[in-house]
Swiss-Prot record:
<dbReference type="InterPro" id="IPR048304">
    <property type="entry name" value="UbiD_Rift_dom"/>
</dbReference>
<feature type="binding site">
    <location>
        <position position="197"/>
    </location>
    <ligand>
        <name>Mn(2+)</name>
    </ligand>
</feature>
<protein>
    <recommendedName>
        <fullName>Anhydromevalonate phosphate decarboxylase</fullName>
        <ecNumber>4.1.1.126</ecNumber>
    </recommendedName>
</protein>
<feature type="active site" description="Proton acceptor">
    <location>
        <position position="247"/>
    </location>
</feature>
<keyword id="KW-0288">FMN</keyword>
<dbReference type="InterPro" id="IPR049381">
    <property type="entry name" value="UbiD-like_C"/>
</dbReference>
<dbReference type="GO" id="GO:0016831">
    <property type="term" value="F:carboxy-lyase activity"/>
</dbReference>
<dbReference type="InterPro" id="IPR002830">
    <property type="entry name" value="UbiD"/>
</dbReference>
<dbReference type="Pfam" id="PF20696">
    <property type="entry name" value="UbiD_C"/>
</dbReference>
<keyword id="KW-0464">Manganese</keyword>
<feature type="binding site">
    <location>
        <position position="134"/>
    </location>
    <ligand>
        <name>Mn(2+)</name>
    </ligand>
</feature>
<dbReference type="InterPro" id="IPR049383">
    <property type="entry name" value="UbiD-like_N"/>
</dbReference>
<keyword id="KW-0210">Decarboxylase</keyword>
<dbReference type="Pfam" id="PF01977">
    <property type="entry name" value="UbiD"/>
</dbReference>
<dbReference type="Pfam" id="PF20695">
    <property type="entry name" value="UbiD_N"/>
</dbReference>
<dbReference type="GO" id="GO:0046872">
    <property type="term" value="F:metal ion binding"/>
</dbReference>
<keyword id="KW-0414">Isoprene biosynthesis</keyword>
Length: 424
């Protein structure tokens, strides 16, 4: 299968909304992304650039692109995270055709909301190489023509940067933007230190398209060839204020001192499309939440052998609320599944466990299961003062109360809870 660049992918979407009129990158672009929140949008003129947003704002669109369905998507991601595959190193890349000095202020980097600290790169991924290759999403707030401040949560890239700083060095990185969804999903996974997200992306690509992920060696760092923009950059030991910024819950994150990135050189394909990822939008939900579903699945599967599906819900920002479908074999399986789900995704605040006859992708069916199969005095699990998500504004000092709803049928009364159905 021939590799598709972003333009071909975008123009293949049947529900694509095209905005032909000029649009400003500060706030105006956001209005269109909010208006068409679940549809892909292509802006033909954002201060001279083409910009696309809401590209992966639905589970079905992602699944279709990866040649699968909702259930298959979970299995695909789970398998890729369990069994990463080597990527392929090639000699050519379309982005090498154009090499320029960086001026971040001239790029269509949006300021999404009025209280944002500045224009934000939101869809960019950072690639760093030490003893292994790490790929991860990091928001970056533009400071001037060549500098931005990067949010580094204490995970793998932070560890690499910290090691460089302690040795009196800057961390050399490649920043990529405008990539297909298999790389975006891989970049949002949380895997063990030493596992390369490029190999997870390659496993997804092999399963979905029959070919591995292709990269080019760009001065020592593997860089995906299907990138619209590539930046050579360095993360320094200097810091600056980062934020405010609207995170996945739609609320503003706090201002912190974070490292400064210096952008040294820019590459891009001919007529590139800039990917604008709306903070707190459906696309943000999908790309951040979908890679957590296999982790919940793996955790629940350790205590309940038959797990049929996991869904982080849009109403819970695909971060705080989940639904899990199981086949109950013993009384207590529902509660064990609840506890395992919380262990699989520690940011989770609420989980509903249902039987396999309930469609977890239909909120009405899930609520029906709660209404007809759940009794609060018997089936509710509450865990007070647990470590939760820092993104939950109702929590305090990282602590939250978690609650689980066991909406499964009692094994000794299955017939009394049978759903009426008719084949036609």
């Amino acid at each position: 299968m021939v590799m598709k660049m972003l333009r071909e992918i975008v123009e293949s979407f049947e529900d694509l909304v095209v905005i032909d009129k000029p649009v400003k990158k500060e706030l105006e672009l956001t209005k269109f992304l909010l208006k068409y929140k679940d549809k892909p949008v292509l802006f033909k003129d954002v201060e001279g650039w083409e910009v696309a947003g809401n590209l992966w704002s639905s589970r079905e669109r992602i699944a279709k692109f990866l040649n699968t369905d909702n259930k298959g998507l979970l299995e695909l991601l789970y398998e890729a995270m369990e069994k990463p595959k080597p990527f392929s190193v090639v000699e050519k890349a379309e982005f090498l055709k154009n090499r320029e000095k960086v001026n971040l202020l001239e790029l269509p980097i949006p300021k999404y909301y009025p209280k944002d600290g500045g224009p934000y790169l939101t869809s960019a991924m950072v690639i760093a190489k030490k003893e292994f290759v790490n790929v991860s999403f990091h928001r970056m707030m533009v400071l001037d023509e060549e500098r931005a401040v990067i949010r580094l949560v204490p995970r793998h890239l932070y560890s690499m940067w910290k090691d460089s700083v302690e040795h009196g060095e800057e961390l050399e990185v490649r920043i990529v933007l405008g990539n297909p969804v298999h790389l975006l999903l891989a970049g949002a996974t949380s895997v063990a230190y030493g596992v390369s997200e490029l190999e997870i992306a390659s496993a997804i690509s092999l399963k979905a398209f029959g070919r591995p992920l292709e990269v080019i060696n760009l001065d020592g760092i593997p860089t995906p060839v299907d990138s619209e923009f590539v930046f050579k950059a360095k993360i320094t030991d200097e810091v600056a204020d980062e934020g405010p910024f609207v995170d996945i819950t739609g609320t503003y994150d706090i201002v912190r001192k974070q490292p400064i990135v210096i952008f040294e050189e820019m590459y891009h394909v001919d007529d590139p499309i800039f990917h604008a990822l709306l903070p707190g939008g459906y696309e943000h939900y999908m790309l951040m939440g979908l890679p957590k579903e296999p982790q919940i699945y793996a955790s629940v599967k350790k205590v309940v052998p038959k797990v049929h599906g996991v869904r982080l819900t849009e109403g819970g920002c695909m971060w705080l609320h989940a639904v899990v479908s199981i086949t109950k074999q013993h009384e207590g399986d529902g509660k064990n599944a609840i506890l395992a789900a919380f262990a699989g995704h520690p940011s989770l605040k609420r989980v509903v466990v249902v039987d396999e006859d309930v469609n977890i992708y239909d909120d009405r069916e899930v609520e029906w299961a709660i209404a007809t199969r759940f009794q609060p005095d018997r089936d509710l699990v509450i865990i007070p003062n647990a470590r939760g998500s820092s993104l939950d504004p109702s929590g305090k000092d990282g602590l939250t109360a978690k609650w689980g709803i066991d909406a499964t049928k009692p094994l000794d009364k299955k017939k009394e809870f049978e759903k009426a159905s008719l084949d036609f």
